[in-house]
A protein has these predicted regions:
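Catalytic alpha-helical scaffold of carbohydrate-active enzymes acting on polysaccharides/glycoconjugates
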Residues: 1-27, 32-72, 93-113, 120-166
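Positively charged, amphipathic and often flexible ligand-engagement surfaces
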Residues: 73-91
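Short, local alpha-helical segments
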Residues: 83-85, 112-117
Length: 166
């Protein structure tokens, strides 16, 4: 898509979000982690608080083709349900323990779990409820992404600029 097409898509999506929810969207997430320089430029133009378009270990400011962008990227750190579902090594009864193990193995990190309303909210609702319950029992703290972004941006100079790779 051209820059103009990406811009038109985001403007339309943000207008619909505003119509439905009554307030402006302050973030975006590219489907399938398909982010590029055009989407990053449009995010910067929209002055988004943050985006969550990638996989990674820690928040950063993306750089693509040598150009740095200003919208904070908070990457997903955990696999999505659909990435585990149907794989023989992850039958449903092992998924919750797998997530807990990933979080415990790197407990110092703030983990980001990307969910899909059509999976975790519908088809796998029971499994998602089990995960939430187990996280509660284990003392996992849930925080809002916008609060996390604001906390990070309070010390903007400490956030690294990193190349965004596919």
């Amino acid at each position: 898509m051209s820059l103009a097409e990406v811009r038109a898509e985001l403007v339309a999506a943000r207008a619909e979000f505003l119509r439905i929810f009554g307030f402006e969207a302050r973030t975006a997430g590219a489907p399938g982690w398909q982010s590029n320089a055009q989407s990053r430029e449009v995010y910067d133009e929209a002055n988004l608080l943050y985006a969550s378009d990638t996989r990674g270990g820690a928040p950063f400011f993306p750089r693509i083709g040598g150009k740095p962008f200003n919208t904070l990227e908070i990457p997903s750190t955990l696999p999505t349900f659909d990435e585990l579902m149907g794989r023989p090594e992850y039958p449903d009864h092992t998924i919750v323990a797998h997530y807990l193990g990933l979080m415990k193995a790197d407990a110092a990190r703030t983990h980001v779990f990307t969910l899909h309303a059509e999976i975790e909210g519908m088809g796998r609702r029971t499994l998602f409820q089990e995960l939430l319950g187990a996280c509660s029992v284990e003392g996992v703290e849930f925080i809002r992404m916008d609060d996390y972004a604001r906390e990070l941006l309070a010390n903007r100079a400490a956030i690294p600029v990193r190349d965004q790779v596919r």
